[in-house]
Amino acid sequence: MLEDYYPSTTSYYHGGIDDDLYTAKWGMVMTFLDLNDSSLTPFEGTHFALIGFKSDKGVYINNGRVGAVESPAAIRTQLAKFPWHLGNQVMVYDVGNIDGPNRSLEQLQNSLSKAIKRMCDLNLKPIVLGGGHETAYGHYLGLRQSLSPSDDLAVINMDAHFDLRPYDQTGPNSGTGFRQMFDDAVADKRLFKYFVLGIQEHNNNLFLFDFVAKSKGIQFLTGQDIYQMGHQKVCRAIDRFLEGQERVYLTIDMDCFSVGAAPGVSAIQSLGVDPNLAVLVLQHIAASGKLVGFDVVEVSPPHDIDNHTANLAATFIFYLVQIMAQHS
């Protein structure tokens, strides 16, 4: 039995029901699935599993604005309203949440990793609704556990921050997940392939830039780089990064986008990547056929305005799933 795991029992769609897939919405089509059901066998074809990670403990430890614990419900509500474009050959299952208000951050990350591995064993592509960016380490661990030790797993992070902070004194938090991945790779004598899109210089200290400069395998583009390059050159840079890689894990921190597009985040951003450009880049990553799982994190509903940020996060999920279904 999976720990800290609660299957979904309540629909987030409250509109009319229509059996016609040409007019259906996500909330009509998505089906509940209990990962603890021992009778389940691996699914055939391309299907997705949506799980919430109800934790912003890492944000609290990192002195950010808490509230991301409420994000899975907010994103589900927005996603449920979107039109269904996936026909009858692709299914998105809502498998519930990882939740444990009295559990430690490390315990919740471990529980998420086991749920992710369970999804992969069932041939379901994971979509995780954070949660703070501590979500990423649990998601990554689960993906790695589903692979053999020699298998590669590159990481693309759309984020204003490197999230490579040391954690020997503070302990793990929302800003340390990728340093934990890096340290795991060093311990296993693997190269950590990590590409950050949307870095803002005013959000990262010189220690982090120095660490990146000295670390083989880590690349980044600033938000200003992306603005100047345009999406086609950014996509070519991603292609070069993914050359020779068979798998990539994608994580989207909603503070990558300006406060005008994403006001409800743990750490607001005055600058930021254009969401329209981001959609084109995300679709390109999905079209590589290498994307094995993704998450959207750091949505903070108590700080959102008219669900702008939750809706944008749901929009990214809509387009990523659409392209992944075509290229898997």
Curated annotation (Swiss-Prot):
Binds 2 manganese ions per subunit. GO terms for biological process: L-histidine catabolic process to glutamate and formamide; L-histidine catabolic process to glutamate and formate; putrescine biosynthetic process from arginine, via agmatine. Pfam families: Arginase. Its cofactor is Mn(2+). It catalyses: N-formimidoyl-L-glutamate + H2O = formamide + L-glutamate. Pathway: Amino-acid degradation; L-histidine degradation into L-glutamate; L-glutamate from N-formimidoyl-L-glutamate (hydrolase route): step 1/1. CDD domains: Formimidoylglutamase. Its EC number is 3.5.3.8. It is an enzyme of class 3 (hydrolase). Catalyzes the conversion of N-formimidoyl-L-glutamate to L-glutamate and formamide. PANTHER family: ARGINASE/AGMATINASE, FORMIMIDOYLGLUTAMASE. This is Formimidoylglutamase. It comes from Streptococcus pyogenes serotype M1.
